Amino acid sequence: HTRSSAASDVYKRQALGVLAGLLAGMFGIGGGLIIVPVLIGTFINLGFDESIIVHLAIGTAISCIIFTGLSSANAHRKKNSIDFDNFRPVAFGIIFGALAGAFFAVQIKGLFLKISIAIFIMIVGIQILFDLSFSSKRIHPNKNKSIFAGSVIGFLSAVLGIGGGTFSVPYFKSLGLSLTSSIGTSAACGVPIAIFGTFGYIIAGTNVMTLPEMSLGYIYLPA
């Protein structure tokens, strides 16, 4: 029975990975929107310490996005749908924002983070439902504005455990990029969010004694 239960868990995680990958490719989001709530439920069932469950779920989700993000970004690169001129300064800002977001998130109580994630999911639903549109006129922001935008995107993404597409796609659309380029460039932005967010959660959880075995900081490796 234990073996069949373990096999079932593996299949569930594989299905979750496929779904996250599809979301990353189609909408430029990293799949964390689905992964975080599922991991929270999984960690509760495993009996992990309540004080670290949400943080562990977010950190683990961010680390999973590294693989889906790389795959998605590579697919968009092959289709020439990444605007590298806009990507570079935003990605630079993301590095600092994602690190800061990880360190900030672990200082916040899990309940507040859960409420924040729930509100965020509602906002995403509204955004999709009403198909909020932005400027179609091409804008060329200065680098400092792009770096600032990247730091905000990186910060919020690391706090919520997502690939950032919900923030970066509308941002790139507001600059007048086509929807295809906005999604492709956003998918590329998911890679530095995931890498530096993961790095932040690893460092932030280095000396936390309540984390379960097989954790690397706030990353639960078996997931």
Features from the language model and the residues they span:
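Small-residue-rich hydrophobic segments that form or flank transmembrane alpha-helices
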Residues: 12-21, 25-86, 93, 150, ...
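Transmembrane helix exit motif
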Residues: 8, 67-79, 118-141
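Alpha-helical transmembrane segments of integral membrane proteins
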Residues: 59, 89, 112-119, 144, ...
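Single conserved hydrophobic/aromatic residue that forms the stacking wall/gate
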Residues: 1-7, 11
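Hydrophobic alpha-helical transmembrane segments of multi-pass integral membrane proteins
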Residues: 19, 146-159
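Selective transmembrane alpha-helices of multi-pass membrane proteins
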Residues: 94-99, 110-130, 219-223
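Small-residue-mediated transmembrane helix hinge/kink sites in multi-pass secondary transporters
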Residues: 76, 101-106
